[in-house]
Amino acid sequence: MNQVDLNCDLGESFGAYKIGLDEEILEFVTSANIACGFHAGDPGVMRKTVKMAAEKGVKIGAHPGLPDLAGFGRRNMAITPEEAYDLVVYQIGALSGFLKAEGVTMQHVKPHGALYNMAAQSRELSDAIARAVYQTDPELILFGLAGSELVLAGERAGLKTAHEVFADRTYQEDGTLTSRRQNDALIQDDDEAVGQVIRMVKEGKVRSLQGTDVSLKADTVCIHGDGAHALHFAKKIRRELRAADIKVQAFST
């Protein structure tokens, strides 16, 4: 039987602003990537999200981003590898405190947004991020875009890695995600998105926007929790994966 982890970016509310349906989404995912206060989140939100995830038995990961609250961490910044290292160590440390207080362990680290995409294509940034994760805790799993520099860097550093694919994003023929600045970056049809996931898990292939099949590995699937119909989609993909005889469980299980 095929199996896959289902992850979601959570804990992205901050201050007076509520983003996403975290408590509801946690019923359907097996891993949660919790924002650490730089691109989103705040101490109170981090504490509450860790507690909710722990109570539901969902594995927890740090979701470090660039220091860009206004841009939600989705805008590229010119940072050095040393700065990337510092950002990741700092944010892992921030979330670790709440995990320790709740009596649970961290499963993984998944960079957010622009940091994730920049690292996917830069060996220097990826090596710095992987080193930050390894030196913080060598038992952590590094989540990265399937086949990307980030996954390769994690392997070089001696980390366990998870190749990540996306349910609602389109792909280019080189295996990268279509830029969000393009109109066709997101898959709007739920059935199409679910079909893409099932094919990636079962066949290890995805159809690019250019019409070619791209080979990839799918260890974990990212769904988004901040869309208008995020909860509906979370329920649907969990149900359809089960119907396709795909077991959904945390990557570390």
Curated annotation (Swiss-Prot):
One of its GO terms (molecular function) is ATP binding. Its EC number is 3.5.2.9. InterPro entries: Glyco_hydro/deAcase_b/a-brl (IPR011330), LamB/YcsF/PxpA-like (IPR005501). One of its GO terms (biological process) is carbohydrate metabolic process. Pfam families: LamB_YcsF. It catalyses: 5-oxo-L-proline + ATP + 2 H2O = L-glutamate + ADP + phosphate + H(+). Gene3D superfamilies: Glycoside hydrolase/deacetylase. Keywords: ATP-binding, Hydrolase, Nucleotide-binding. HAMAP family: PxpA. Catalyzes the cleavage of 5-oxoproline to form L-glutamate coupled to the hydrolysis of ATP to ADP and inorganic phosphate. Forms a complex composed of PxpA, PxpB and PxpC. This is 5-oxoprolinase subunit A. It comes from Bacillus licheniformis (strain ATCC 14580 / DSM 13 / JCM 2505 / CCUG 7422 / NBRC 12200 / NCIMB 9375 / NCTC 10341 / NRRL NRS-1264 / Gibson 46).
